[in-house]
Design a protein with these regions (language model features):
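N-terminal assembly/interaction segments in proteins that build large macromolecular machines
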Residues: 1-132
């Protein structure tokens, strides 16, 4: 990158994506279920974040990521994980800008987690409840 911060970020992002794609076929057998209820009590989310081992599933940063993703689902109202419903990328969780870091998508945030934890990490399902 020769001192160019933007070039370095691009290189790291590419490395992170490559690392994630290499681990994508690994089996998910552990994880956590996280919940988030909005302060007004009318919107709630249950989200399952999967990984390969209990060791990672019990990691504080992994649990915090699951909570952040549940909060994201509450705020952004995705209808699918990766556009399985065909309603478009704007309603696909993985394609949305991550609310805690709008400069990256949820998919990019998960790729960073895969690189950090060294394990396949996926949102396996979520449900958003709303009283309205």
């Amino acid at each position: 990158a020769q001192g160019d911060k933007e070039k370095a970020r691009a290189i790291l992002a590419q490395y992170s994506e490559n690392s994630a794609s290499k681990k994508a076929d690994r089996e998910i057998v552990a994880g956590v279920v996280s919940s988030y209820v909005h302060s007004n009590g009318t919107i709630g989310v249950l989200l399952e974040l999967g990984c390969e081992t209990d060791f990672v599933a019990k990691n504080e940063e992994f649990v915090a990521l699951a909570k952040d993703l549940a909060m994201h689902v509450c705020a952004m109202s995705p209808t699918s994980i990766n556009n399985e419903d065909g309603l478009g990328e704007e309603t696909a969780l993985l394609k949305q800008a991550f609310i805690k870091s709008p400069d990256m998508t949820v998919e990019q945030r998960l790729a960073g987690a895969i690189q950090k934890f060294g394990e396949n990490t996926k949102v396996t399902r979520f449900t958003r409840y709303s009283i309205a």
